């Protein structure tokens, strides 16, 4: 469900969503004749974007994801470091996966709206590591700076002498408007 934040940010930044965008959740969403359920049976009623984040409403994000589009969701997710190794330097780090909506190999079905629906709640082809999600959420909290994660701050001798110390290392800035970060942070509280 934390991936829903990427959909919200992508929607706000692209103009596909506003804080006042409302969708109704009766507990399910139909795309054609395929039913996608919410986690809450009976639904959440009508919610704006903040309410959808607070309640983690699947039905809201199914519809928001279709409006935002898969390309924008993936673009914003990559900007936050999803789909790449976090850079811990501990060997075999998980890269994770983000969907590639480009046409698939011959004989395989192409990308569908149903794929976009399930991606919008972080399922389907979305694979992330806990460290990637920590990097993403810390960037939201600090206004968009992606820092290289560390698991060790300082190495000290038994005597207490500092042998090595690691300072925060900014990797890049996520190009998101301050008001978008402020809105998302407030909704997360």
Write out the residue ranges for each language-model feature.
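Beta-lactam-recognizing serine transpeptidase/beta-lactamase-like catalytic domain environment
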Residues: 1, 6-189
